[in-house]
């Protein structure tokens, strides 16, 4: 609805399943930060063809049922909640989490935590999370259709074609029928 920064300072990306006339998600992040993260890869001759967000709004049919992720460690941990209504990151502290805990879906939500955040997450949230390494979460993120490489970060036509082939290959390789071969 409103941007908290100047549009020229932000990189914007549209959700992958956007349809004309329908509500859609627009992701926003600091353009300078994103370009600085990409620059070393491109300087090393590794052009970036896809930029995947770590967390996205859920695409499930239940708009209320969230997924919770505890990140970080016991000294600096975060709780990330995602559902079809968006993504929210809060410090993993009792006061910050209290408003979410009153939600009826809280106890039924899928709950994951990085190994270093398990103890503090369990103590504050009041239930045991499933342990999930950050790398596991990143692999799951890479399997979504989201891509921030849009607009001024989109590559040439040849690179876009290669990207489409790569996307098709990734879908094929991650298809359930190929699981025994992996």
Model-found features: residue ranges?
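Hydrophobic/aromatic-enriched cytosolic interaction surfaces used to assemble or bind macromolecules
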Residues: 1-182
């Amino acid at each position: 609805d409103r941007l908290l920064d100047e549009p020229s300072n932000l990189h914007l990306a549209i959700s992958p399943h956007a349809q004309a006339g329908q509500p859609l998600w627009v992701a926003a992040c600091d353009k300078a930060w994103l370009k600085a993260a990409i620059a070393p890869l491109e300087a090393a001759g590794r052009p970036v063809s896809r930029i995947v967000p770590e967390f996205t709004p859920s695409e499930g049919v239940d708009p209320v049922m969230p997924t919770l992720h505890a990140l970080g460690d016991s000294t600096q941990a975060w709780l990330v909640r995602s559902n079809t209504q968006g993504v929210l990151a809060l410090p993993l502290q009792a006061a910050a989490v209290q408003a979410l805990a009153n939600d009826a879906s809280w106890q039924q939500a899928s709950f994951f935590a990085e190994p270093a955040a398990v103890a503090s997450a369990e103590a504050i949230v009041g239930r045991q999370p499933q342990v999930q390494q950050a790398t596991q979460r990143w692999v799951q993120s890479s399997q979504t259709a989201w891509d921030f490489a849009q607009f001024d970060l989109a590559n040439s036509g040849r690179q876009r074609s290669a990207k489409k082939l790569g996307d098709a290959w990734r879908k094929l390789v991650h298809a359930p029928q190929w699981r025994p071969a992996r």
